[in-house]
Amino acid sequence: MFYHPVNGSIPIDRTTMDYVAFGIGEQPLILIPGLGEGMQTVKGTALPMALMYRSLAKDFRVYMFSRRTVMPETFSTAEMAEDLYYAMQQLGISSANVVGVSLGGMVVQHLAIQHPEAVKKLILCVTLPCPNDVLVDCLSRWIDMARINKFGSILTDTAIHSYTDSFLRKSLWFYKLFAGLYRTKHADRFITMAKAGIAHTALEGLANISCPTLIIGGRHDKIVTGEASEQLHSMIPNSELYLYEDYGHGLYEEAPDFWKRVKEFFI
């Protein structure tokens, strides 16, 4: 019932990439998380992830990859995509359904462009093709906070910019409590990943994405904007767009039908 959880790491350039795997299905499904993973990799989380995503674990073998643990000061989303492709090769995954959320969505755009054979179907969730003023403002603020180790403030600010008012009324107290206790050893890694988001662009290659693609966004997204999803849709041939009218950047946690929608697209 725990869906065969596995914690693993892949050696790469004198560091490692942590990953978890779980699920009893035959089809591989890859999930690439957003910037929050910059504070803490997925190391050791296979069992809780299997329980959290059990609706997917029944039909897929799910893989969630962190970026490399130690990064240079500058490391682009395109380079992260090359790391992901390398990790897939090391695990014998020739082709997979792929979901990228926020910064993870920027990474998998490059994966689909540079290695089309590796992506069977693609979901781009709350992400964008290139930076806009809203994203740059958020990431620049979080970089400034990270430089003085105010990661608790980053967590709280992210929640305020991600969730609906009704969700925040019920949950913000928890984020503030957790933020007061939160510590990370990965400040430099987080900053590198945030800078990669500011520098991201896939504009020249999006027209070459040939796999079936679903773009999911939130009309009230205060981090990448809902318009960014519409922009992606206009640039990726034959893509589908679903825009949640009542949610923002945290729609993948708030929208009750989100993972059902993901599952139906892949099946």
In which residue ranges do the predicted regions lie?
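Short beta-strand/loop motif that positions the catalytic acidic residue
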Residues: I209, I215-G217, D221
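Conserved alpha/beta-hydrolase "nucleophile elbow" surrounding the catalytic nucleophile
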Residues: A96, G100-G105, G218
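Conserved alpha/beta-hydrolase "acid-adjacent" motif
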Residues: K222-A228
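Conserved acidic catalytic loop of the alpha/beta-hydrolase fold
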Residues: E79-A96
